[in-house]
């Protein structure tokens, strides 16, 4: 079966801090942020690529849900694949924003074979892996695409 990742949802405690991290450090385009701030939509999002978004659920949504926190103990990390050039720029932004690299650069196997990865956490402790694959076009912004 072939499919696309449509979205991932993070339950967040401080949505403004998370919007800032994912839009300024990770360079994911913010979506519906002004509408969220105006109370017109229930949560903001950031776009990873043309097919995938990350929804940032504020506490008022996930605290009242019967499913709040379910599965959190099962999520180890998520991984984004970048061109080598974008990966190197991310390293600089992480350093400039005092984000600690927990591991890496290290070789890792993934969806496109062997790549080079780093691991770090967002402001609320979610573990993120960022990798590049040798030989991919360095002008590509993000390899997560259909």
Language-model features, listed with the residues they occupy:
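N-terminal beta-strand motif that seeds the catalytic metal site of vicinal oxygen chelate
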Residues: 1-19, 78, 134-146
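Core segments of cupin and vicinal oxygen chelate
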Residues: 2, 10-54
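Vicinal oxygen chelate
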Residues: 4-13, 44-48, 66-146
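A short, acidic/glycine-rich surface segment
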Residues: 32, 61-67, 104, 138-139
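Conserved beta-strand in the GNAT
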Residues: 55-57, 129
């Amino acid at each position: 079966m072939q499919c696309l990742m449509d979205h991932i949802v993070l339950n967040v405690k401080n949505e403004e801090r998370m919007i800032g991290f994912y839009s300024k450090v990770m360079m994911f385009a913010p979506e519906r942020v002004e509408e969220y701030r105006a109370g017109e939509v229930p949560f903001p999002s950031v776009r990873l690529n043309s097919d995938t978004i990350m929804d940032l659920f504020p506490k008022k949504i996930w605290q009242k849900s019967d499913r709040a926190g379910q599965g959190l103990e099962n999520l180890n990390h998520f991984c984004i694949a970048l061109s080598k050039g974008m990966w190197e720029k991310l390293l600089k932004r992480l350093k400039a924003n005092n984000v600690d690299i927990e591991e890496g650069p290290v070789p890792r196997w993934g969806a496109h074979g062997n790549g080079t990865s780093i691991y770090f956490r967002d402001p609320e402790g979610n573990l993120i892996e960022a990798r590049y694959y040798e030989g991919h076009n360095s002008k590509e912004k993000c390899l997560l695409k259909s």
